[in-house]
């Protein structure tokens, strides 16, 4: 594997091509710790009460976790246990790593859901006709550049972080710690509105490590054990640039290095900067919060259109008002990659999908405790989730 290591090299970019970059963060990143704790709490409630109404936020800093939010549920939850188990799973199990699930302080500031919201959204209403939990706009995106119908930039960034966790847990690289960040720049060619990845232009990897390992050993291992295992060789060439541990030292990480907060990695969670984002975070929210459920449904719509051969690339927008069940608007943008007009695609979507929250929850089975798995390595592009299974469209 050739390429430029930790040096600036501006490769010539041919006419008709462009560069695009996406980033991902590992399970031990402080913001991602918060997201995973939120969804661990949500799952704990859904295991006992599938109709629980959960809006949970988390703050993390050295030796401390704060849970805040509004929850109405019949479940009896040991929040101390749920939070500590989530942190243990991530890998912060000793104070030498800067955080320890056994000794951290867990503060709980949870209240009931506002009765004003409850009466406007779901009380005394059939499940199919429950209203949206808030106003907002959500997007779904899909592209035919990968089998997952996800951008290659974010697919590779997530896979690099997931592989780092695997190498840490199986002992291959024992100096690894849970906090990590990756970033991938890909050179693309445009093809009548669709995009085709040509090569990987730049890879950035920063990973928390122990005191003993030397920089050269880390850089060599990241190239040989990580990048070669994850990035297909056809995308790497002598001009690929590598910034591996560019800061030189990353011993202090996780909540000790930076405060963590729910919902600060919404682009990592979705499409890596492609498409669009309505601004709402996912983790810690039950299905009545359309920030989450409608974004999942919009992805389902987008992937179904691409996998159905109706377009090569598509962006779907939906919007809602609090207490209103039907979406206020549905919009389709196909980037010129469809033989059908955007109006025709919109009619196909309306005839095949019911985007009321109470129907989305049924079609995508969103009352099941599946959410902790979504909270790291992206909510989209993994076949184990119902919204990633394309619907066979009738038109």
From Swiss-Prot:
<feature type="region of interest" description="Flexible loop">
    <location>
        <begin position="113"/>
        <end position="125"/>
    </location>
</feature>
<dbReference type="GO" id="GO:0004478">
    <property type="term" value="F:methionine adenosyltransferase activity"/>
</dbReference>
<keyword id="KW-0630">Potassium</keyword>
<dbReference type="InterPro" id="IPR022629">
    <property type="entry name" value="S-AdoMet_synt_central"/>
</dbReference>
<dbReference type="Pfam" id="PF02773">
    <property type="entry name" value="S-AdoMet_synt_C"/>
</dbReference>
<keyword id="KW-0007">Acetylation</keyword>
<feature type="binding site" description="in other chain">
    <location>
        <position position="70"/>
    </location>
    <ligand>
        <name>L-methionine</name>
    </ligand>
</feature>
<dbReference type="GO" id="GO:0036094">
    <property type="term" value="F:small molecule binding"/>
</dbReference>
<dbReference type="InterPro" id="IPR002133">
    <property type="entry name" value="S-AdoMet_synthetase"/>
</dbReference>
<dbReference type="GO" id="GO:0005524">
    <property type="term" value="F:ATP binding"/>
</dbReference>
<feature type="binding site">
    <location>
        <position position="258"/>
    </location>
    <ligand>
        <name>L-methionine</name>
    </ligand>
</feature>
<feature type="binding site" description="in other chain">
    <location>
        <position position="113"/>
    </location>
    <ligand>
        <name>L-methionine</name>
    </ligand>
</feature>
<dbReference type="GO" id="GO:0009410">
    <property type="term" value="P:response to xenobiotic stimulus"/>
</dbReference>
<dbReference type="Pfam" id="PF02772">
    <property type="entry name" value="S-AdoMet_synt_M"/>
</dbReference>
<dbReference type="InterPro" id="IPR022631">
    <property type="entry name" value="ADOMET_SYNTHASE_CS"/>
</dbReference>
<feature type="binding site" description="in other chain">
    <location>
        <begin position="264"/>
        <end position="265"/>
    </location>
    <ligand>
        <name>ATP</name>
    </ligand>
</feature>
<feature type="binding site">
    <location>
        <position position="258"/>
    </location>
    <ligand>
        <name>ATP</name>
    </ligand>
</feature>
<dbReference type="GO" id="GO:0042802">
    <property type="term" value="F:identical protein binding"/>
</dbReference>
<keyword id="KW-0597">Phosphoprotein</keyword>
<feature type="modified residue" description="Phosphoserine">
    <location>
        <position position="114"/>
    </location>
</feature>
<keyword id="KW-0067">ATP-binding</keyword>
<dbReference type="GO" id="GO:1904263">
    <property type="term" value="P:positive regulation of TORC1 signaling"/>
</dbReference>
<comment type="function">
    <text>Catalyzes the formation of S-adenosylmethionine from methionine and ATP. The reaction comprises two steps that are both catalyzed by the same enzyme: formation of S-adenosylmethionine (AdoMet) and triphosphate, and subsequent hydrolysis of the triphosphate.</text>
</comment>
<dbReference type="GO" id="GO:0007623">
    <property type="term" value="P:circadian rhythm"/>
</dbReference>
<comment type="pathway">
    <text>Amino-acid biosynthesis; S-adenosyl-L-methionine biosynthesis; S-adenosyl-L-methionine from L-methionine: step 1/1.</text>
</comment>
<dbReference type="Pfam" id="PF00438">
    <property type="entry name" value="S-AdoMet_synt_N"/>
</dbReference>
<feature type="modified residue" description="Phosphoserine">
    <location>
        <position position="384"/>
    </location>
</feature>
<dbReference type="GO" id="GO:0046872">
    <property type="term" value="F:metal ion binding"/>
</dbReference>
<dbReference type="GO" id="GO:0048269">
    <property type="term" value="C:methionine adenosyltransferase complex"/>
</dbReference>
<comment type="similarity">
    <text>Belongs to the AdoMet synthase family.</text>
</comment>
<feature type="modified residue" description="N6-acetyllysine">
    <location>
        <position position="81"/>
    </location>
</feature>
<keyword id="KW-0460">Magnesium</keyword>
<feature type="binding site">
    <location>
        <position position="291"/>
    </location>
    <ligand>
        <name>ATP</name>
    </ligand>
</feature>
<feature type="binding site">
    <location>
        <position position="285"/>
    </location>
    <ligand>
        <name>ATP</name>
    </ligand>
</feature>
<dbReference type="GO" id="GO:0009725">
    <property type="term" value="P:response to hormone"/>
</dbReference>
<protein>
    <recommendedName>
        <fullName>S-adenosylmethionine synthase isoform type-2</fullName>
        <ecNumber>2.5.1.6</ecNumber>
    </recommendedName>
</protein>
<comment type="subunit">
    <text>Heterotrimer; composed of a catalytic MAT2A homodimer that binds one regulatory MAT2B chain. Heterohexamer; composed of a central, catalytic MAT2A homotetramer flanked on either side by a regulatory MAT2B chain.</text>
</comment>
<feature type="cross-link" description="Glycyl lysine isopeptide (Lys-Gly) (interchain with G-Cter in SUMO2)">
    <location>
        <position position="234"/>
    </location>
</feature>
<feature type="binding site">
    <location>
        <position position="31"/>
    </location>
    <ligand>
        <name>Mg(2+)</name>
    </ligand>
</feature>
<dbReference type="GO" id="GO:0009416">
    <property type="term" value="P:response to light stimulus"/>
</dbReference>
<dbReference type="GO" id="GO:0034214">
    <property type="term" value="P:protein hexamerization"/>
</dbReference>
<dbReference type="GO" id="GO:0006556">
    <property type="term" value="P:S-adenosylmethionine biosynthetic process"/>
</dbReference>
């Amino acid at each position: 594997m050739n390429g430029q290591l930790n040096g600036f090299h501006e490769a010539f970019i041919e006419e008709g091509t462009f560069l695009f970059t996406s980033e991902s963060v590992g399970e031990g990143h402080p913001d991602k710790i918060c997201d995973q704790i939120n969804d661990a709490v949500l799952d704990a409630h859904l295991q006992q009460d599938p109709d629980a109404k959960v809006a949970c936020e988390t703050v993390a800093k050295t030796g401390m976790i704060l849970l805040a939010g509004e929850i109405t549920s019949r479940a009896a939850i040991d929040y101390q246990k749920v939070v500590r188990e989530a942190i243990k799973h991530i890998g912060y199990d000793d104070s030498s790593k800067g955080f320890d699930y056994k000794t951290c302080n867990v503060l709980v500031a949870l209240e009931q859901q506002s009765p004003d919201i409850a009466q406007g959204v779901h009380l005394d209403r059939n499940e199919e006709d429950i209203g949206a939990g808030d106003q907002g706009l959500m997007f779904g995106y899909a592209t035919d550049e990968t089998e997952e119908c996800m951008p290659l930039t974010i697919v590779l960034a997530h896979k690099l972080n997931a592989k780092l966790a695997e190498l840490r847990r199986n002992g291959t690289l024992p100096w690894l710690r849970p906090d990590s960040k990756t970033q991938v720049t890909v050179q693309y060619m445009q093809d009548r509105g669709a995009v085709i990845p040509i090569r990987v232009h730049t890879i950035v990897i920063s990973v928390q490590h122990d005191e003993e390992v030397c920089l050269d050993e880390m850089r060599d291992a990241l190239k040989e054990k990580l990048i070669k295992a994850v990035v297909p060789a056809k995308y790497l060439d002598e001009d690929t640039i590598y910034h591996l541990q560019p800061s030189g030292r990353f011993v202090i990480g996780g909540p000790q290095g930076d405060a963590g907060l729910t919902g600060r990695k919404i682009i990592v969670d979705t499409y890596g900067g492609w498409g669009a984002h309505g601004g709402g975070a996912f983790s810690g929210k039950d299905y009545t919060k359309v920030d989450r459920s409608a974004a999942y449904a919009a992805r389902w719509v987008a992937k179904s259109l691409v996998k159905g051969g109706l377009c090569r690339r598509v962006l779907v927008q939906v919007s809602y008002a609090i207490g209103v069940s039907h979406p206020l608007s549905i919009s389709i943008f196909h980037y010129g990659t469809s033989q059908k007009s955007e109006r025709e695609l919109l009619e196909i979507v309306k005839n095949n999908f019911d985007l009321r929250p109470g129907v989305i929850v049924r079609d995508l089975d969103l009352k099941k405790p599946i959410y902790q798995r979504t909270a790291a390595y992206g909510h989209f592009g993994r076949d184990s989730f119902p919204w990633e299974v394309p619907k066979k469209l009738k038109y």
